[in-house]
């Protein structure tokens, strides 16, 4: 799994918001990818250095509710923020993020959330 990650030019990660954070399965994957000496290291001065290289990272985030910026529940969103921190730890500081939210708030909200996500996908560079 680690070598596949290191060899990849582009990595797309599905990130569902479960109880304000990521799933245990995604956490297990992160634990296998954040490996000292392989994807990060500490310099002699104690500074962190990411070793994951220059890859394109795309996070596809799904949320049943609305947790985006400006939402009353935004402070409870710890999936996208966690993934940004974990990827930054290995030197991948600018993931592209597609968010579908409001998916559990009824058919109209779901359709709007999916349409917004599709627009974000369409705007990604090829």
Per-region residue spans from a language model:
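Helix-loop-strand module that forms the ligand-binding subsite of alpha/beta enzymes
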Residues: 2-75
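Glycine-rich phosphate/pyrophosphate-binding loop and the adjoining helix
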Residues: 69-126
């Amino acid at each position: 799994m680690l070598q596949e990650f290191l060899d990849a030019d582009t990595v797309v990660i599905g990130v569902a918001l479960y109880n304000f954070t990521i799933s245990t399965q995604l956490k297990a994957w992160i634990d296998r990818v954040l490996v000292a000496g392989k994807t990060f290291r500490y310099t002699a001065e104690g500074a962190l250095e990411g070793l994951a290289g220059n890859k394109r990272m795309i996070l596809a985030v799904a949320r049943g509710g609305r947790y985006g910026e400006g939402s009353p529940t935004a402070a409870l969103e710890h999936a996208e923020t966690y993934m940004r921190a974990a990827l930054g730890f290995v030197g991948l500081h600018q993931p592209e993020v597609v968010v579908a939210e409001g998916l559990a708030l009824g058919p109209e909200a779901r359709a709007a959330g999916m349409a917004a996500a599709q627009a974000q996908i369409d705007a990604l560079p090829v």
